[in-house]
Amino acid sequence: MDFNILTLGCKVNQYESQAMREDLLKNGYFLSENKDKADITVINTCTVTSVSDAKNRKLIHRVRRQNPDGIIVLTGCMPQAFPGEMKELKECDIILGNKERSKLVPAIEAFLAHRSRLVDIPGYLNRGDMYENLTVSSFGEHTRAFIKIEDGCNRFCSYCIIPYARGRVRSKPLSALKTELENVALGGYREVVLVGINLSAYGSGEDYDLADAVETACSIEGIERVRLGSIEPEQMDKELISRLAAQEKLCPQFHLSLQSGCDKTLKAMNRHYDTREYAEIVGNLRAAFPNSSMTTDVMVGFAGESEEDFQASMAFVKQIGFAKVHVFPYSLRKGTRAESLPGHVSPAEKERRAKLMGELADNSRKEFLQSQVGLIEEVLFERLRHGYLEGYTKNYTPVHVTGGDSSLCGEVRRVRLTAAAGDYCEGVLSD
């Protein structure tokens, strides 16, 4: 039987979809050439916002409409967060929670044997859940591989449903991580990105931490670059930063989640830092990693955010000088503490604030790219498109080099950055 996997959401979901893909292939299933008519369609969902849920439902309806006789497997964060609702979703033949993805093949075989709808969404424990044994050995045709090392979150930000969808923090053992990284390196991947739901909590309750994971990744022969996924700022203490800075393979690019640049809003969000602490951590990272890039997420229009609060957030974002900012309006999430907070902002006002913050983010991006012009940087080329090579520097600046050929894809070359253009830098080969 053939299959197709549709993935919504974060890099962790992408990793888990790849793990399920490899599991299916290993057990005799094969990728569908006609994805709209696959015998089995796995939908790996995201539920970070209500907009995400709407996308999930729209995709389920489309798949069932296009392929009325196919088997639909629903998994990911949406069924885990809302098991009661999902059990009533009759369009799906198999529904698996986040803890059950490693049981995908047995679930499909059970369904085929009995042709009876299967729903398996066990809840999480307050503590004591084991890390799910998912692994990958490749990541399609990409030049970088995402490697999940952590799952779950203990933070319970007031706007966020993810702790309910992912459970408490648990971590991949270092021995398992080393084996997985060795297999990925054998597959020719020269860059890996370590990802997790709350990545900087890796090793919580264990005798290892994020620095140990980075040191393990950097020790693997064949892997030349190691990146970190999104990290929470307050867990980046000086000792951790010092250990990270000792690893030459670690790329100086940090996605340091902010959410708001206003202390009052951060407190209402139940974030675990204030703007002073955040700025200090950014300063420590920049001191340890010269020419590093800082990227972030900023939410506008959170419940109770006044115009004064918004302006404070704008001023702080400008002060930090991010390389890139993902701006998004607050979306009320059923089942979170923020649902009952007073002072919800109108959609029109959230849109206005998102536009203003977006303009600030665009200017910050332009300033960062311009700051890279004149530098000679190592670029890992990923593809040849429209007559130019595309790749990234270690600090994740996108670079376009006119000319060259596809033989350079997957190779690292020194490039002199000559101009900032749009969302990238132009450059010429330096050697």
Where are these regions (language model features)?
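Proteins enriched for Cys/Gly/acidic motifs involved in redox and nucleic-acid/cofactor modification
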Residues: 1-201, 239, 254, 276-287, ...
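Radical SAM enzyme [4Fe-4S]-AdoMet core and its adjacent flexible, acidic
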Residues: 10, 203-218, 222, 269, ...
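Short glycine-enriched, charge-decorated loop/helix-capping segments at active-site entrances
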Residues: 47-48, 166-167, 267-273, 340-345
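Conserved SAM/AdoMet-binding glycine-rich loop
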Residues: 73, 81, 86, 186-307, ...
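Short flexible coil/turn linkers enriched for glycine and charged/polar residues
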Residues: 140-143, 153-154, 250, 260, ...
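Active-site proximal loops enriched in glycine and acidic residues that flank catalytic Cys/His/Asp
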Residues: 196, 230, 258-260, 296-300, ...
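Hydrophobic, well-ordered secondary-structure elements that form the walls
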Residues: 256, 297, 317, 325, ...
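Terminal RNA-binding accessory module
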Residues: 340-431
